[in-house]
């Protein structure tokens, strides 16, 4: 997925060496949430400075293929205000990068047809959890919702990446219901089938590589368990599924 924050220089150098592509992202998460028009108080000048610093430091890393302005902003409640905030940052990113890499903003809003900001980016990146947070456990309904949304994004005529999707999975728990390893595989097979039907979808980035700790809460069973690997890097069934899937892409 997009990085959610600028990676360390050491990590970017490792990605350069190993051929791992990176979507470099400013640490701007959830901008535009709350209030009648929250973009009136959004920190545009500071955001521009952070973007400037990130591109100045990291522009020479060949692993970076895409700049992301931020993650999961509210871009549909006040569409014009959102566009007025994000579009100058989009132009700034193109101005700053001598290689003129494409620029994106990762969207997550449910009323995507009202959004005028995400469609204006060079690449459409969307985070979607049909079958998990929405339509929980109902993979047939999740597939229908995913196909309906992808039909909409096809009209935008931009390369599209499903930049987050996943299901919490407790390693060693088996069955057909949510939180089992089997459900995680079925979930990914269901959503990936929707993506494979659409040639404008150019990428998929499962959330997440490995389980990680979070604050306690009723939605977290000992942290975020959406990893393809456990916290100590042991593969779940989904890791083997994706290895086979991606190896077949090479053919």
Predicted regions located by residue number:
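Aromatic-rich peripheral "rim/lid" segments of glycoside hydrolase catalytic domains that contact
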Residues: 198, 202, 207-251
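Active-site mouth of glycoside hydrolases
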Residues: 1-135, 143-159, 169-174, 178-182, ...
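A short, acidic, amphipathic alpha-helical segment used as a generic capping/interface helix at domain edges
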Residues: 188-193
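Short, well-ordered beta-to-alpha junction loops that form the rim of enzyme active sites
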Residues: 107-108, 164-166, 208-209
